[in-house]
Amino acid sequence: TVKXQLSMVLDLNKEIGGQTXTAA
């Protein structure tokens, strides 16, 4: 579902943001 995908995307964003130090 869209909700599930959105949750996954947000989780990925959090992981990437933590690695780069910057989150958009």
Swiss-Prot record:
GO terms for cellular component: cytoplasm. Disulfide bonds: none annotated. It is found in: Cytoplasm. GO terms for molecular function: 3 iron, 4 sulfur cluster binding; 4 iron, 4 sulfur cluster binding; metal ion binding. It comes from the Bacteria. Binds 1 [3Fe-4S] cluster. Binds 3 [4Fe-4S] clusters. Its cofactor is [3Fe-4S] cluster; [4Fe-4S] cluster. Keywords: 3Fe-4S, 4Fe-4S, Cytoplasm, Electron transport, Iron, Iron-sulfur, Metal-binding, Transport. Optimum pH is 7.5. Its main location: cytoplasm. Heterotrimer of alpha, beta and gamma subunits. Electron transfer subunit of the chlorate reductase. This is Chlorate reductase subunit beta. It comes from Stutzerimonas chloritidismutans (Pseudomonas chloritidismutans).
